[in-house]
Amino acid sequence: MAFDQSGVSMSIPKRGFAVSEYERRLDNIQKLMFESKMDAILLTTQVDIEYYTGFKSQFFQSPTRPWYVLIPSSGKPRAIIPTIGESGMRDTWIEDIQTWTSPNPEDDGVSILLSNIKSLMVNHKSLGVPKTLESTLRMPLEDYETLIKNLPGVEIKDANKIMRRVRFVKSEAEIEKIRHICQITSQGFIDLEGFLRAGESEQENCRRFKQHLLKLGVDDSPY
C-alpha cells in the first residue's frame, strides 16, 4: 500500500488506460499529421510504441530484436513485430498485427515494414520519423538505410515535433497516474534518511532505496 506525506493511504489508480485514451492520442497526432502533410509515422522505441498501443514488454530490454509501429494518416496503428511479442500485442487495442520470426539476420522485418510503408504513401509521399531533440532510432542503421533506399520519392520528415505537442497536453487519466507516482516517490525520499547506512557504498544504499520504492508500489525504478 502507498502512503502520502502525512502517512494517509493513497488511492491507487487503475492500471493501464482505457481504449478511449489511445483513441484520443491517435486522433490528436493524426490531426497534426494532416497539417504536416504526413502519410505515416514510423515508431521504433519502447516509449513511443507503448504510448500509442499500450503494449508493455520486457522484451524491449534486449537489443536483439527491432519493433515497429506505423501510425497511418487515418485508421488505427499497425504493429510489425517479432512473433515473440504477438500474444502481448493482441491484448492491446491494436488489430493489425504482422509478425516475423526474429532474429533473422537476412531480413529482420524490413521487407514487411517496407511493404506497409509503401501501402500508406498515398497522399503526400511523406514518412514521419522522430529525428530531433530527445528522439532515438531503435533499429539497425543498416536496416534503416536499406529502408530509405527502397523508398524513392518518399520525403522523410521529422515527426518528433508534432509527437511532442501531443504529449505536452495531459489527459485527466494521465495526470492521475503522474500524481500517484510522484506521491510514492516523494514518500520514498521522505523515508530515505531512515534506511541509509553509514559506511555502506552508494550502490548498496541505492539498492535499498529501490527496494523501498518497490514496496511502496512502483513498477520499476531503473535509475
Q: Language-model segments: what does each one mean?
A:
Residues 1-184:
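A composition/biophysics-driven feature that prefers long, compositionally simple stretches
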Residues 32, 36, 188, 195, ...:
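Short alpha-helical functional segments enriched in proximate histidine and acidic residues
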Residues 39-40, 194-200, 219-221:
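Surface-exposed helix-capping loop/turn segments at secondary-structure junctions
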Residues 182-193, 202-205, 209-210:
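Active-site pocket-lining segments that scaffold enzyme catalytic pockets across diverse folds
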Residues 208-223:
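Acidic, glycine-rich loop-and-beta core segments that form the ion-binding/anion-interacting portion
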